[in-house]
Amino acid sequence: MNILFVINDAPYGTEKAYNALRMAMMLQKEQTDIVEVRIFLLADAVTCALPNQSTPQGYYNIERMLRAIINKGGQVKACGTCSEARGIKGLALLEGVEISSMSQLAQWTVEADKTLVF
């Protein structure tokens, strides 16, 4: 089963990115043989892909969560237009995260058995 997570919020300030990644990690842990996880970072969520961020007190480390998902075979892409609008398109991203496009998001959506939007 192919599950697509579309995340829209910044890594810190709300718990949307955290909850999306927590769900993705749980699916990878408990449904290893039947689930393929894909994550598309959209809008302010593209900043989730920046390495070495300071984790605010009381929050979980989003970088660590993304790395765990990637290390278990999850695919993570960040919207190029959103990255450019936020001035991060030329910056180094977490290893395994690729700048992508709405065309890719459309393709992933068509291929997904389920799409979850946070």
What are these regions (language model features)?
Residues L4-A20, A49-S54:
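Short, glycine-rich nucleotide/cofactor-binding loops
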Residues D9-A10, A43-V46, C82-A85:
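Acidic, glycine-rich active-site loops and adjacent beta-strand->loop/helix elements
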Residues A17-E30, I39:
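Histidine-anchored nucleotide/phosphate-binding helix
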Residues A24, E36-A43, V76-G80:
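Short internal beta-strands
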Residues I34, I39, C48-P51:
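Primarily the HKD phosphodiesterase
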Residues N52-Q57, L93-E95:
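Short glycine-enriched, charge-decorated loop/helix-capping segments at active-site entrances
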Residues T55-T81:
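A glycine-rich helix N-cap at a beta->alpha junction
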Residues A85-F118:
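C-terminal structural segments of small proteins and small subunits
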